[in-house]
Amino acid sequence: LSLRQTKTDKVDARTIASMLMSDVNLKSYSDTFYHNEELKSLTRYRFDKVKERAKLKTSVSRLVCILFPELEKLVPTLHMASVYALLSEFPSAKHVATAHLTRLTNLLSKSSKGRYGKDTAITFRDSARASIGSNMPAKSLELKHTIKLIQELDSEIDEIENEIKIIMDEINSPILSIPGINYRMGAMIIAEIGDFNRFDSPDKILAYAGFSPSTYQSGQLDGAYAHMEKRGSRYLRYALYNATKYVCHWDPTFAAYLAKKRAEGKHYNVAISHAVKKLVRVIYHLEKTKQQYIKAA
């Protein structure tokens, strides 16, 4: 570097080159790093969208309880295409009660792909005519708009998931060979952990996710029942916890391990946390060795 006040492209280029050559810790921008950053952005974006949709679904349940409370007992769930189609067209018990039977039948048949027909339409209309639901135009309008927002979010989430799947297909991670881990949850785990070479052991990943037990000691008091730290990446903690529940359902080895911990008298959440540790050890091994998970016979 010169003490003279010189600013040219050549001087700038030489300065940058000198800095890069002197820093031995700098690493090139790899495809793996790019994929991890893209996945992190996409999975966190999806997480926020799903959370937003969940709040809207709660609002739908609340509004239906006001406008047509009997409907919830007539269907498996309010959050299905046929129910949304019904409420978008007839957003209260009064609207359903006065609906033309042919129109109601056609709407239900089309939106349910033939599952619901005339008999269901009659059941809905009879229930609506005897309903104790309130006739509130403002709430009906809110219900229609809320359903529309949910449908828009569904479309956005599908688009995000398509982008996630494209990247996951390129990465071809071995953790997707674990029963119960799909590309959505797998993508979240990979994105939040990033480069597995950063971690010397599975315990470091657990600490990074906030699954390590906290330590409390003061005087003669030593915390015997330490809680999890719950620090670090909340996204990774969420992904590992939920992935573990699915894996324990679909994989016999993990199912037996969870049952063993429950038989020892541990609370369900405590037993799941033990299974999380086991899953992280498996994921760490698979990513380090690039081996596929072999399901026990």
Where are these regions (language model features)?
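A detector of single, family-specific signature residues
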Residues: L1-A297
